[in-house]
Amino acid sequence: MILACASVSGAQTQPRQALLLYSYERDFASHNAFATMFRPELSRLFGEPIDFIEVSLQAARLNPSASEESIMNEVRSTLPRRRLDLVVPIGGPAAVFAQKYRQQLFPTTPMLLAGVDRRFVQNRAPAANDTAVTV
């Protein structure tokens, strides 16, 4: 499954770009455990440098006046100017957010929904280049 994502973007001279989109703070135990194992494994599978961009949705949600659109704009502002090679929403809220705003943020980028409860994805049709690892 990860190998399929690894082959999508072809050869590049610049490091690949992978977005880890956390539902909660990165120090949240299950997110941290996943990311700690995932980053080196993905780097090993790609066999080339990867720049990991890590964004937590919780910080944006703590602002009571933040609308979903303002959160989307905040996420967009952290993304690199170059195209992402992989988007990895971690947890249910991040998966729902990524699927909802996929067209505005990363319409053609492969997405690996990680550590997601089935209830967060069962009623949403995945894009052709989406894969979910549900719990």
Task: Cite the ranges covered by each PLM segment.
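Short hydrophobic alpha-helices and adjacent helix-cap/hinge residues
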Residues: 2-135
